[in-house]
Structures are given as C-alpha cells and as structure tokens.
C-alpha cells in the first residue's frame, strides 16, 4: 500500500500537498501528491510499495499543519454493487488489517459530501459486523489497535485502509464535535476550545488548564477566547482597546486593560497562559510571541497566524522557524505545534510550551 490520504480544509489542498511532499522528502520517502481543488483531501502516492505504511508510522502526525487526518490506502474500489457493497470492502481489507480497534466510514468535509455522509453513518453498522466476522476488526473497540478507514469519494466509490491510533487524529474525519456555548460572546471561542483538545492531552488538562491560573488574552475584544479561560476558573488580563462582554466582566475573574496588545507588558511573573487572536501580519505576531516566550512572560501560548493569499505553507514555515530560532538563540527548550483547526478559516493556530531553560541557572518554574 503506497498511497496516503490526507484530509484537509477545502481550498487548502495545495498547502497540504506541499507540506506532505516536503516532510516526507525530509525522511527520504519520495512520491508525488494528487490534488483536486476544493476536494477536501490530498493523496500522496509513494514511489516504493511499502512507503505509505512507513510514512504514517514514522512521521509524527502532530508535526503536520494542514492535515486533519491521514491513513494509508490501497487501490480505489469503484462501481460497488448497490446490492452488496460490503463483500468487496471486506475483501480489500482482509490480510491488510487484523483485529483493528475501530471502524471509521468517512467522507471529505465538503458540501457535496453531506448526503454521502448520511449513507456512511447508516452503512457503518452492517460493515462493522461483517469486518468483525472476517477478523479485520476486533470484537470490541480498543484504542490500542489500528483504526480501519473506509473513505468514500463518491457513491459506490471508496478507498480502504488504516491508521495507527498512536499517530493519527482521534476524531472522526479529524474534526472535534464541539457545541457553541450560548453564553460565549463570539464564535471564535470554539477555536481556542478546539486548540485545547488538539494540543493538550486530556489527562493533562487538570494540571495545565488548572483552576486559579493567571492568563493574558491579547486582542481580547469581545472575549471569545477569554471566555474559555474564565470557564476554567482562571484569572485573566484581557488586553484590547475594544470593550469586553459584560457577562465576562461580571464574573470578577477578568481585568480589562485598554491597551494595544503589541505594546502591553505584563507586570506579574506567574502567568501560565498567553493567548492571542489578533488580525495582523503573521510575521509581526510571530515576533511578539517570540518576545513573550524568550522573556519568560508566560509558560504556554496559543495564538493564530493569519495566512496570506499565496505561498501559505511557506509563510507559516518561515514564521515557525523564526520562533524556533529565537528560542534556540536564548537557550530555551520548547515544544511547537501548529494546525489549521476545523474552526480556523484563513489562518493556522500555533501552540508553544516552554519546557525548561537549556542554560544553567535559568528557571522557568515561575
């Protein structure tokens, strides 16, 4: 199996293709990307027959920015007979996956696929039973075994394959299902909530998103991101010349500072989180974020980089490389991750966590 399907936001297929070609090439897994505009997915076809499996095992999924999900697949199954779609699919998967832990019957995230998605949900139940009978799936769901993927690109037309549960997205179609909280002041709140789900393991939330932490929200108005911090019982400095939602001010947890987010300098030394969703050139935002991290003004940050119209992968890569270079120059170890989230539009969301200082005598445990 030499093909890898990568699901992405429709309209960002070229960026997804450029990224997987670049990062696979760095690992000497060579191939080419098949791209169809606004399809919501890319197929990376490796030149060597087993390199699809090698790619999804060895390249960390968390290092990808534009892919929501990925899985290795075989040849396209076409013209599935309406009276029996199951038998050909089971036949394709036998000998490829044994005792898989979960089945996901998916489509690309496009308007055209909405009707097909309804079919996929109905089709999952009988297909799961048949795959269990054939030994392709285990008799119970388990996160310790590979995920079996059946990816429909049209009625009667699908790819079959698998991903590794320790190196994929845990979400169906790579999309966390989040509900907009009615009391939140703007829909942007879902970006930060999704970022927490994507970047922070669930078993670390109590420690890293803890009650009583101090946080800063740069460019906070009207308070969509501040809302997520307040919901987790943090104390928040919300920095913006624009007004904050009164409902947030009434909590008593928010201090509104009428300042420019680029000029604000914190006075506290125990700020755990800084978040930022400002509409500004990505290079300017990256420089500000690097300044906060280098100076130790926060332990972790989540921020958005707005994307230009062209060369979007190159621009994001350049901005992330700049932040990494600044951290390296000042002897700071950090984890950097970036992802175009489901709730992002022409932007990507970045998470940086300071780990420890590489220089003796420096402490990050403020």
From Swiss-Prot:
InterPro entries: RlmM_FDX, RlmM_THUMP-like, RNA_MeTrfase_FtsJ_dom, rRNA_MeTrfase_M, SAM-dependent_MTases_sf
Binding positions (S-adenosyl-L-methionine): 188, 221-224, 240, 260, 277
Matching Gene3D superfamilies: 3.30.2300.20, 3.30.70.2810, Vaccinia Virus protein VP39 (3.40.50.150)
Active-site residues from the entry: 306
Entry-linked Pfam families: FtsJ, RlmM_FDX, RLMM_N
Entry's EC annotation: 2.1.1.186
GO biological process: methylation; rRNA processing
Gene Ontology MF terms: S-adenosylmethionine-dependent methyltransferase activity
Keywords: Cytoplasm, Methyltransferase, rRNA processing, S-adenosyl-L-methionine, Transferase
GO CC, any one term: cytoplasm
The organism's place on the tree of life at top rank: Bacteria
EC category name: transferase
Reaction it catalyzes: cytidine(2498) in 23S rRNA + S-adenosyl-L-methionine = 2'-O-methylcytidine(2498) in 23S rRNA + S-adenosyl-L-homocysteine + H(+)
Compartments, record wording: Cytoplasm
Family indicated by similarity: Belongs to the class I-like SAM-binding methyltransferase superfamily. RNA methyltransferase RlmE family. RlmM subfamily.
Protein role: Catalyzes the 2'-O-methylation at nucleotide C2498 in 23S rRNA.
Subunit details: Monomer.
Protein name: Ribosomal RNA large subunit methyltransferase M
């Amino acid at each position: 199996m030499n093909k890898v399907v990568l699901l992405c936001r429709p309209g960002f297929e070229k960026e997804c293709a450029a990224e997987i070609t670049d990062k696979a090439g760095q690992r000497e897994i060579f191939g080419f990307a098949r791209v169809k505009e606004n399809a919501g997915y890319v197929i990376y076809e490796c030149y060597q027959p087993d390199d699809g499996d090698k790619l999804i095992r060895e390249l960390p999924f968390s290092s990808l920015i534009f892919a929501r999900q990925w899985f290795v697949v075989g040849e396209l199954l076409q013209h599935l007979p309406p009276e029996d779609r199951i038998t050909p699919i089971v036949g394709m998967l036998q000998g490829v996956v044994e005792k898989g832990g979960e089945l996901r019957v998916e489509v690309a995230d496009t308007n055209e696929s909405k009707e097909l998605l309804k079919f996929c949900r109905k089709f999952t139940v009988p297909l799961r039973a048949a795959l269990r009978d054939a030994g392709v799936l285990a008799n119970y769901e388990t996160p310790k075994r590979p995920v079996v993927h059946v990816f429909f690109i049209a009625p009667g037309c699908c790819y079959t394959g698998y991903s590794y549960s320790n190196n994929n997205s845990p979400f169906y179609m790579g999309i966390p299902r989040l509900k907009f909280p009615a009391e939140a002041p703007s829909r942007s709140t879902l970006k930060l909530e999704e970022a927490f789900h994507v970047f922070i393991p669930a078993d670390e939330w109590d420690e890293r998103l803890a009650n009583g932490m101090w946080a800063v929200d740069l460019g906070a108005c009207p308070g969509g991101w501040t809302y997520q911090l307040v919901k987790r019982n943090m104390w928040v400095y919300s920095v913006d010349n624009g007004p904050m939602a009164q409902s947030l001010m009434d909590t008593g947890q928010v201090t509104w500072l009428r300042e420019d987010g680029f000029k604000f300098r914190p006075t506290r030394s125990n700020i755990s989180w800084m978040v930022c969703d400002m509409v500004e050139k990505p290079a300017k935002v990256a420089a500000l974020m690097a300044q906060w991290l280098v100076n130790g003004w926060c332990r972790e940050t989540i921020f958005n980089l707005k994307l230009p119209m062209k060369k979007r992968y190159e621009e994001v890569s350049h901005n992330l490389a700049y932040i990494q270079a600044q951290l390296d120059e000042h002897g700071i170890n950090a984890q950097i991750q970036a992802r175009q989230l489901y709730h992002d539009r022409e932007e990507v969301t970045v998470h940086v966590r300071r780990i420890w200082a590489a220089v003796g005598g420096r402490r990050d445990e403020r």
